[in-house]
Amino acid sequence: MPLIEIIDDNTFQLYSTPIESVQVGGFDWNLIFDWHPVPRYEMARRKQKTDPIRSPTMAGGLFAINKKYFETLGSYDPGMEIWGGENLEISFKVWMCGGELVCTPCSHVGHIFRKRSPYKWPSNVNVVRKNTVRLAEVWLDDYKNYYYERLQNDLGNYGDVSERKALREKLQCHSFDWYLKNVFPEQFIPGESQYYGEIRNQAEPQCLDSNGDTLGKAIIGYVCHGQGGNQYWMMSKNGEIRRDEHCYDYAGGKSALGQKDKIFTYNCHSQGGNQKWQVVDGQIKHESGFCIELSADKVGVFMQECDKNNVRQLWKWKKREDKPKA
């Protein structure tokens, strides 16, 4: 894989990535591709900065592969439509079926990112969901259930995947558990979380909502919709409230100025501190000793002194007893 460089769609200026800033591909449990810093163990494995970098996944579209090998792997899944999921499918099967996916830091390809999709999307089917469910059914084994939780197990009609499963068996590919342990060991596993799902206030039908996926936004209260997405949260075994790589972060300090303290989302850092929480008798308590409270207008979410008699500080959150079953 090359480094994908951005070409400005107005000026055609090329923005080049410094070799020290190269990232590798990953994915979240919505089965969406994302970028990650190169892990320390991978940096240590390489002898010089121009050496290839192993990557768990790729963005797709820009890569080189031997044609015969590509066909042996089954090419792209013919049951997938238009766009979405195909890059993760080829990433997983390359690694799980004996290959290796690497980024070559000295290879650069410029790309103009479209502002809108040029495709005509069918109105009667969620194409991306169909594609990613096919991907999950064939390659994720029991880990597919973490994705299905977020879909409320509404898989839709994803077609027949028997031929793709037969291909995997014929190629004698590794399990997805092997992939996570050997290729992407830094990936957060939802089954290790203590709580999961929506965080619903006991006084009002309001849930804690990320207000979009942009880092640095304040958590808000929003009518519970039961669709996951912005309202799907997990508490890790380390006490982080997170969705994939985004964690609740509370720095404090505003209350001393007579202002209300908000909670923001930032990249998870696994260091505790601002990102460490616990659930105590329905209250969500921060390391600082303050608790999460829904404001009287049902929209604001603030940190306040803990009061077990204040129902706006009481939340319902599903406790995970076991990993989801197939």
Residue ranges and their predicted role:
Residues 1-177:
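Catalytic cores of eukaryotic secretory-pathway lumenal/extracellular enzymes that build
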Residues 28, 34, 71, 177, ...:
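Compositionally biased, low-structure terminal segments
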Residues 12, 81, 91, 119, ...:
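A generic signature of intrinsically disordered, low-complexity regions enriched in glycine/proline
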Residues 186-326:
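Lectin-like carbohydrate-binding module/patch detector with strong preference for beta-trefoil
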Residues 164-191, 196:
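Eukaryotic Ser/Thr kinase distal regulatory-tail detector
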